[in-house]
Amino acid sequence: MTDSPRPVSRRTFLHRSTGAGAALLAGGVLAGGTAAAAPPARRLAPAGIAPADLDPLALLKKMLAFDTQNHGEGGVTRPHAEMLKAVWDSAGVSSEIIPTPKKDNVHLIARIEGTTSAAPLLLLGHSDVVPVERAKWSVDPFGGVVRDGEIYGRGALDMKGANAAFVAGLLRHLNEGGRFDRDIIVLTDCDEEAGPHGSRWLAEHHWDKIDAGMVLTEGGWFLAQKDRTTPMLITVTRQDKVYFNLDIVADGTATHSSKPNPDSAIARLSRAVTAIDTWLAPVTLTPVTREYFSALAEATEDAPFKRALELMLAARSQPARERAAALVVKRSSYPWLHRALLRTTHAFVIEDAGYKENVIPSTATLRLNCRGVPGGQRPRDFLAGIRERLEGRDVTVKLVGNAGESEEDALKRLDETFSRPPSSIDSPLYTAIGDAAAKTYPGAVFAPALFEAGTSLYPWTSKGIPGYGVYPYVLDNDQLIGMHGNDERIAVAALKQGTDFMYRLFDRFRVR
């Protein structure tokens, strides 16, 4: 294409001796200003694709209409898969629904045939979503309501919005008669949010259908300047935080509720929670997170925030690093995100205590969901720190492992995940992402990053296949923290611009 900048290289993004830095892209805003022009329509040989399926907003509304809530053991994803299969059928793309042992919980695999035997590109997007608290939503969470320029719905951000951008971007190429230099596999998986039949199960039973040379899924955030609209930092994640759970268990005497006892399990658990409520694990900066925060310092127009980032990156002692990191979080427009990227986190997620109002229970349990920084603090060291913090409080801290797994075996498994290197930035997909960012978000900085959450990438990355993540829409902080929350939403303009981004990304693999 004539608007293509010079090819992106490793040197472009890692231009400092420490590996810190990012590519600066020239001029433009998302809203309230001039955005990059949309790619020209090139209609070569239109396929039988419905016009609505080329529109990411219309496609997202169709996806949101399906209730694919996953309460822990998988959801009902077949109707959603059948809808999407019809979309692929209309485009002349072969697709297959893969049932799992759970009724109506399925995967969908579509394969666009390429012109060579090059290793396929796989797009990975889950169809299941977390449950909703309907009473706390201001709109129908499955209604696809558009209000004040934002589309609301469970999965609008995570990750049906991304799926809509992925699919609509590909369909635009197919509608133009485009072909690609390799197969492109689109896997719409289930059980990403929880359940036994996710991507690992699929890899065990159908690896031949999803074997690929590189994978793109959810992950990297597209952040805005302090004005909440101007694109600031476009990131692609190349590594996930390490996921593990701890249970804090308190025991006491069970008795009739008319006789409150001094060794109440619930009271003991509450005191333990207080002891770690505001406690933070140590700040750890790895090459991946240093690269990210260096790019953020380059990208921001907020001078006090920039200074805080520079202080943190330059800190020579742990106390100085902790003080500067606290300032970074305080001055950030995305404080929860940046606090999560700095350290191992622990979140209070499930409390289990009591079963009848006239019985004081003998046991109370709190689950902590923890996310460790790979290459930072090891999960076993975090566990030791929590136990030390709660020593003498009459509670037990247990690492939650797999069925039949000892604590040491679970820690060894986590050590292996913790030590796995990030995906390489020397790949055609990484280059394509950077090139698309340069064309779509001029004026923003592009950089690799760590994903503070988790993905379905394990079956590929465990085999050394590079996997990356993006949420292809610019978000403000309110939208970002709506992920898994109430009134989840994204901006319609951001979704459409993100689809342009995906179109340009796929253009790198198009045959001329």
Segments (PLM) and residue ranges:
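Stable alpha-helical elements in mature extracytoplasmic
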Residues: 55-60, 80, 84, 162, ...
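N-terminal helical capping/dimerization or prosegment-like subdomains
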Residues: 40-134, 363, 367, 379-383, ...
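Hydrophobic, small-residue-rich alpha-helical packing segments that form membrane-like cores
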Residues: 188-214, 218-235, 241
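N-terminal secretory signal peptides
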Residues: 1-12, 22-28, 34-36
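Solvent-exposed loop/turn segments at secondary-structure junctions
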Residues: 69-71, 103, 116, 127-131, ...
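Metal-dependent amide/peptide-bond hydrolase catalytic core
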Residues: 38-42, 51, 221-497, 503, ...
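Sec-exported extracytoplasmic/periplasmic mature domains
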Residues: 61-69, 89, 93, 171-175, ...
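Active-site metal-coordination/substrate-binding segment of hydrolases
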Residues: 118-188, 194
